[in-house]
């Protein structure tokens, strides 16, 4: 449809990605949602009218096919939300696993670079475009056991700033949203499916929700075209740093 604003979201099957799809649809975007877990995307498509496509950001062929499908259907992309990410393990470097570091860096760094490179022609085809990268407070902090993950999110910060320099002079805004503690599937994945250990992360805390971060994304992308929200840090009030959290302050009500 002519004039339709197209928002492309990676990692859209759950958490911040799914919440962003819902909120961006309500804000008037047509959402193209990509993820590996296509069964979950089906429900999202029915809920918000999104176009859903399989996507594995670590697979070059998958990324190329995803972008080609968006190009064939829409001809451009107004917004790219690089949300797909992971973090496996919380081990000190001395005990770290190669496979944990590999999947984290392949997804959070190489995957983000690959998707962005592949979508730049479609973003440049829009009158005004926007790239939103999901970073983390781990992109400017470190903590024991977090070497692989914090390295990946420091890289996201560097990539975001580099893109802003490289795209200067073009009508493409570049934003990083850096959340603190958000209650999603992240901790379950980090602890390899140990739900009890994941629950302990949020014990006694009112963490951020996926909708909180989606709300920030929608706010950033709906500013006037000449306004670029460079870098937004969002934490729950109980969290002063990655490793400094006050417990039992009460709920968010």
Kindly label every feature range from the protein language model.
Residues 121, 165-168:
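Alpha-helical segment proximal to the catalytic Tyr-Lys
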Residues 176-180, 184, 196-243, 247:
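C-terminal helical subdomain
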Residues 116, 152:
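Active-site helix of classical SDR
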Residues 136:
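Residue(s) in the substrate-gating loop at a strand-loop-helix junction
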Residues 13-14:
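Conserved glycine-rich cofactor-binding loop
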Residues 91-93, 97-102:
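Substrate-binding pocket helix/loop in short-chain dehydrogenase/reductase
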Residues 55-65, 98:
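The beta1-alpha1 cofactor-binding region of Rossmann-like NAD(H)/NADP(H)-dependent oxidoreductases
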